[in-house]
């Protein structure tokens, strides 16, 4: 040990705070030299602040999984905020999304309906120019909880069970195969209560029927009838309403009220779907619809654009 290290140790104080933060202080306890909350590894405790870039993968303070249940070295998964119009969080394996939270509306993530309950509220997201600061506080001081990214890619909420005197998982991001990002491919919706769990949207067929029948849904579905936007003499496209849905990835946000959201989509021949959600506003999709899931609590109404002939006798859905 060199003289500099001896001086550092002899003039500092280590303190384990009630929050779980291990802090190295100057000997007068006025300045923090180092703290474990700046290096959260695989866990998010109340008071930890994660920092993410809004426009790149330059994430400053992040959650990384362990390599295995017994090996704390950096594993395959990490929590990330990928460049999108709307704020949402991903668990990624390398650079590939594995799970997605859905857009943040200022109170909850649209892809996590259970977050409406008190036991999972308390998240705060602060916007600092091009950086986001994410933290959470206990909404109920009598309910102790923390979050962990497991070595196999699950984001878990852990609650203290007084009767068992132990921690118990009360929620996890991957509860079924439908929670895995894009499991059904493009233009398909995943429903954990159905067999098979993947189903093409109305107006679409499997891109590879043999793979689809064998349970390989990754190629998704393709449109049966081309959209008729700006085709002379053809009828205006219509919209199929899907209720209680996890909205697809790559939402494009525009300034529009609920009444005008559908109009904005119809005016753009590249627009494939739209949705309006309080706190988020008008969302349009101009790329393949991926990672749709059927919810049974909350969720959003998503309107899928189809050729008029795919919905004969049905009026254009109200936006």
Where are these regions (language model features)?
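Beta-rich ligand-binding surfaces for carbohydrates and other polyanions
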Residues: 1-319
């Amino acid at each position: 040990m060199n003289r500099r290290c001896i001086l550092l140790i002899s003039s500092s104080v280590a303190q384990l705070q009630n929050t779980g933060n291990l802090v190295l202080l100057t000997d007068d306890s006025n300045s923090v030299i180092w703290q474990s909350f700046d290096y959260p590894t695989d866990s998010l405790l109340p008071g930890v602040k994660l920092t993410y870039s809004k426009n790149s993968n330059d994430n400053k303070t992040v959650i990384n999984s362990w390599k295995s249940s017994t090996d704390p070295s950096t594993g395959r998964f990490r929590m990330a905020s990928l460049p999108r119009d709307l704020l949402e969080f991903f668990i990624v394996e390398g650079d590939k999304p594995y799970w997605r939270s859905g857009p943040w509306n200022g109170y909850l993530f649209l892809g996590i309906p259970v977050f409406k309950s008190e036991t999972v509220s308390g998240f705060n997201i602060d916007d600092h120019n091009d950086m986001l600061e994410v933290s959470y506080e206990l909404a109920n001081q009598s309910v102790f909880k923390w979050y962990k990214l497991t070595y196999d890619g699950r984001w878990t909420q852990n609650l203290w069970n007084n009767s068992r005197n132990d921690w118990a998982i009360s929620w996890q991001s991957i509860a079924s195969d439908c929670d895995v990002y894009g499991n059904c491919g493009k233009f398909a919706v995943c429903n954990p209560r159905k067999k098979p769990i993947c189903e093409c949207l109305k107006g679409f067929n499997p891109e590879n029927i043999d793979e689809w029948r064998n349970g390989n849904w990754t190629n998704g579905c393709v449109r049966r009838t081309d959209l008729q936007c700006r085709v002379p003499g053809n009828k205006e496209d219509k919209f199929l309403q899907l209720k209680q849905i996890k909205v697809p990835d790559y939402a494009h946000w525009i300034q529009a009220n609920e009444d005008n959201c559908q109009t904005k989509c119809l005016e753009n021949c590249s627009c494939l779907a739209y949705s309006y959600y309080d706190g988020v506003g008008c969302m349009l999709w101009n790329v393949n619809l991926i990672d749709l899931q059927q919810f049974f609590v909350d969720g959003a109404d998503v309107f899928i654009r189809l050729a008029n002939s795919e919905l004969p006798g049905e009026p254009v859905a109200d936006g």
